[in-house]
Amino acid sequence: MNYWIQHRLNCLEQAFNPKYCRALEHTIGIVARQFKAGNKLLICGNGGSAADAQHIAAEFVGRFQLHRKGLPAIALGTNPATLTAWSNDYEFETVFARQVEAFAQPGDILWGISTSGKSANVIRAMEMAKDLGLLTIGMAGNNGGMLKDLTDYPLFVSEYHTPYIQEIHLITYHRICEQVEAQLFAKAGLEAQIAV
């Protein structure tokens, strides 16, 4: 048990190296800037990454720690009718790209999550985002995989084991939510009471 915990901690320490932390700070900056400008965040992923997308959206729409107004974030895997209609009538590979096409406006951000870096529907969504001129955040293991060339703000780790990648992702997006919230609301003199 102690070995397992120590191994996990070692993986986290290796993942959050200076290069990754710099990329994380750049990502925090762009998310805060685009929210402040009135833009929204679209997020997509599959399986555990779809759950992460919902978690991120919930933290921004609701709150992370501060009592504040909601921020516009949409997880693209949450509408079963849209997902199944498009997948049944056309293809699963473009199920997120179609929603990006429908919802995105100039200045919005697409955040694609793929532990493998090769999820076809996330890649197609990122391609659509680039075609529409959106900013893109890519969060992946395997050093980014196929998301590399489609990502403006990369949050890539060299880890290959899915559970470890997911643990890194959780800490990463909690940090983003915390710092974006602090930048946009604590400095504005709004109530900064920690929510229970």
From Swiss-Prot:
One of its GO terms (molecular function) is carbohydrate derivative binding. Pathway: Carbohydrate biosynthesis; D-glycero-D-manno-heptose 7-phosphate biosynthesis; D-glycero-alpha-D-manno-heptose 7-phosphate and D-glycero-beta-D-manno-heptose 7-phosphate from sedoheptulose 7-phosphate: step 1/1. Keywords: Carbohydrate metabolism, Cytoplasm, Isomerase, Metal-binding, Zinc. Substrate binds at residues 46-48, 59, 88-89, 114-116, 119, 166. The keyword Acetylation does not apply. The keyword Cytoplasm applies. It comes from the Bacteria. It catalyses: 2 D-sedoheptulose 7-phosphate = D-glycero-alpha-D-manno-heptose 7-phosphate + D-glycero-beta-D-manno-heptose 7-phosphate. Zn(2+) binds at residues 55, 59, 166, 174. Its EC number is 5.3.1.28. It is found in: Cytoplasm. Disulfide bonds: none annotated. It holds the Pfam family SIS_2. Its cofactor is Zn(2+). InterPro entries: GmhA/DiaA (IPR035461), Phosphoheptose_Isoase (IPR004515), SIS_dom (IPR001347), SIS_dom_sf (IPR046348), SIS_GmhA/DiaA_subfam (IPR050099). It is an enzyme of class 5 (isomerase). Residues 31-196 form the SIS domain. GO terms for cellular component: cytoplasm. One of its GO terms (biological process) is D-glycero-D-manno-heptose 7-phosphate biosynthetic process. Binds 1 zinc ion per subunit. The reaction produces a racemic mixture of D-glycero-alpha-D-manno-heptose 7-phosphate and D-glycero-beta-D-manno-heptose 7-phosphate. Catalyzes the isomerization of sedoheptulose 7-phosphate in D-glycero-D-manno-heptose 7-phosphate. Belongs to the SIS family. GmhA subfamily. This is Phosphoheptose isomerase. It comes from Crocosphaera subtropica (strain ATCC 51142 / BH68) (Cyanothece sp. (strain ATCC 51142)). The lineage of its organism: Bacteria, Bacillati, Cyanobacteriota, Cyanophyceae, Oscillatoriophycideae. The gene is gmhA.
